[in-house]
Amino acid sequence: MQPKFKKMLYGGDYNPNQWPKEIWDEDMKLFHQAGINSTTINVFSWAKIQPSENEYDFTELDEIVDTLTKEDVQIVMATSTGALPAWMVHRYPEVARTDFEGRHHKFGHRHNACPNSPVFQKYAKRLAEKLAERYGDNKNIVCWHISNEYGGECYCENCAKAFRVWLKDKYKTLDEVNKAWNCLLYTSPSPRD
């Protein structure tokens, strides 16, 4: 990875795997015409890269990286952990997030992982390591993009437990939580149970 940027990056997300490969060359021409010099790739490609638990296939991502590198387009490499693959949710349902209404989400959309699931953490770490091993020395990769934008909060027991641990570590006592969060404003402090 480069120690610093050569110039101001100008670009956005690029998902060429959603289009026929014949379009990629035209994309590069349009990038140059528009002055685009960087692009974020691989944001939601986990299912494509890891089609099953112990199988990884970087063929298409290699082609995308090679195309962008050949055209000297700077790459922001995402870890692909913004959306779970179906096999993972089927085999390990606890990796999917639970929303504020208690609904357990499935695969097929973004922000669908429980960040405190040990299974999610294990596979996300393994994928990030494999990406770093494979692409870490590529001079056109200028930074790494982890997960995606904020969203997809999880309210499962793993997350509730982790939140309580965080509160205790940060504030030490419930009185300090109430003070810091101004919980006495609406007549009563947070309950102690």
What does each of the following model-derived ranges do?
Residues 64-71, 111-144, 170-178:
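An active-site-proximal structural segment forming one wall of the substrate-binding cleft
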Residues 6-8, 35-37, 71-75, 137-142:
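Short, well-ordered coil/turn segments that N-cap beta-strands
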Residues 10-18, 45-59, 106-123, 150:
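The substrate-binding groove and active-site-proximal loops of carbohydrate-active enzymes
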Residues 186-193:
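Conserved small/polar residues in nucleotide/adenosyl-binding loops
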Residues 100-103, 166-174:
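Acidic, His- and aromatic-enriched active-site or binding-groove loops in soluble protein domains
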